[in-house]
Every structure is written in C-alpha cells, then in structure tokens.
Amino acid sequence: ERNIPSIPSTLEPAITDSSIIYCTDCHRDDEGSSRGPHGSEFVPILRERYETAANTPENYQNYALCYRCHSRDSILRDDSFRKNSTGKGGHSGHLAIGAPCSACHDPHGVNDTGQSGSHTHLINFDTRIVLPATGNRYPVFTDSGIFSGSCSLICHGKVHNNESYPQGGLSLQNRPMRMNRMSR
C-alpha cells in the first residue's frame, strides 16, 4: 500500500478509490423488459448502455454505465489524463475521435503481468481497436507518475512510439506494462 497524494479524480463524490464495486453495480436484469428476469436490453446483462465499438460518438447515453460512477465533466475537462504538449490526447481528445472508454480501460480489471503496478488506471487495451506498435508483442503503456506516462501502440490509424503525456507531480513508478486482453 502506498500513500498517493490527492489528485483530481474522475470518480463521482460518493465513490472513492477504496470503494468496493459489486457485480450488481453494473449488471442486472430488466424485470419489466421483454427479456424478463434473466436478461437486459443492454448486453451482457448491463444496467445501462456501455458502447465498446470504435467510432462511437461521446454522449451521456452511449456511456451511461461509465457515468454512473465516473464524472463526465471531470473526464471531458481532462482532469486526470491531460493532453500532451502538442494539444493531443487526454480523455476528451480520445473521445472526440470516437475512441470508446473500453479501448484503453477494462472495467473488470487487468490480469497481473508480473510487473509492479500492472493494474494502474485499469489500463488494458482492447486489441480489437488498439494494436501493438512495431516490435512489440502487445500495446504498451508506461506509467511514469501522476499525470504522466507514455504509450507505444497503434490507435486510430496512427503509430505512437513512446508517445508521452505531460509530466507533473510525484513519480510513483516507471515500469512498462504489456497488456493483452484475454477476454471481456
């Protein structure tokens, strides 16, 4: 366990980084729907809509499940994932080009890669959307501290070789994480 300084969070105020998330927080059946008590209009038995396809426009309805716990305003302001020095990136930049939350984040967590910090920010690239950069077996994210990191991957048709995001704050770790989404 480590003491992490306070940084802007994408979480809604009622949710903290120590909150326990239960399956039923995201999954439930629709008693009153045409699918009855064993189904939901949102696959796979989700409470709300959660789009995972590339080129999905950002709006509250498309990511209603994410916005149950995460602040849409904070995400669109790039409070926790800032743009790089060229003005690219950040959550808002990725959402603006139709990258779904699931392109980078896995709500079920990340398989342990055997490296310290391998679960940082639930980053686990969806290899249907994000591909490894030349020479890498998997898309790579390197966390180099608060508000800072880099990606080596192919996303939205562009190769990112060690694409850096702004430096700032205390460096907590500097280990590359190779991600291979086994299943969702």
Q: Model-derived features: where do they sit?
A:
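A motif-centric signal for short, conserved binding hotspots located
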Residues: 1-184
